[in-house]
């Protein structure tokens, strides 16, 4: 369990009420205890909030009137609002969601046997990966718990409503939207706890995936806080290329990153012993057969499956998407070494909802020095 403190600063709304979406179950029970109520009352309210996407205390019919009145005085259930919706020809839906005076983007991806929600963890991103649209927006701030779990809540409510008739309920959540989740552990972990909680969304830990570009101290900390599936944004077979396209590699190189991944796998049950490697395919940058051989050698001691991601363009980007033939040759080399290798099907690129295309609406781009300071505060690891 995470140990984020429930304080007026991090859960109180502008009108002085506690937003219950900011509280995981442990914190919710503490809140109800302070109200003089039994812990099971907290569980009842959570069930209404997440099983039925209910944000009106008066509709919680198994909660007595006195408690409902008390809750209306001191608390609320306020999820961020959708301000724009775009639908792709392939069924993907992208929502622009208001967080204060800015926006983040959340993507719903339906498939035959599942529906995946791609969730953002920050407004913008500080890591400056060269092939990613979000990185070009700069970093503004971390999202609160209510703004992270609120994306899932809002999407579940929309999908369950008549306006999205026929859409599958959300079965998987991936922390692969805007931002680096490990730079916002204090909010991301409680939000994921709610995703997993039986009184929350009740998802399997194998169906909640966190993706990271390699903030090593925070990855070590994550393994002591929660067990979820892990995906890593590797994107290069050597430090020379990765230094260029994923600048955090200059601080935590590939060897250091993969060692941390193996430490996480030793603690984790959710990953079933292997990590997902994400590898964006950039034309004549990292997609040659020689790169595939290097990657196979690099990963020989790391149990994994490999997702090859055709790069999704955005205005002003200096790269091109690898051709299908180059991707096919790359994939065949990896499979010849025995690696499970999947070429990710591009979804939602006609509405800029594909991997690496999320941008949101980030204002007042933060200066590099402030971003570095915020990174350290966000994960509470002074050595970062």
From Swiss-Prot:
Main localization category: cytoplasm
Radical SAM core domain location: 111-350
Enzyme class: transferase
Coiled-coil intervals: none
Record-linked Gene3D superfamilies: 1.10.150.530, Aldolase class I (3.20.20.70)
Matching CDD domains: Radical_SAM
Cofactor section: [4Fe-4S] cluster
Annotated localization: Cytoplasm
Keyword rRNA-binding among UniProt keywords: no
Residues holding [4Fe-4S] cluster: 125, 129, 132
Cofactor notes: Binds 1 [4Fe-4S] cluster. The cluster is coordinated with 3 cysteines and an exchangeable S-adenosyl-L-methionine.
E.C. number: 2.1.1.192
Active-site residue numbers: 105, 355
Record: residues binding S-adenosyl-L-methionine: 179-180, 211, 233-235, 312
Miscellaneous comment as given in the Swiss-Prot or TrEMBL entry: Reaction proceeds by a ping-pong mechanism involving intermediate methylation of a conserved cysteine residue.
Family affiliation: Belongs to the radical SAM superfamily. RlmN family.
Name of this chain's protein: Dual-specificity RNA methyltransferase RlmN
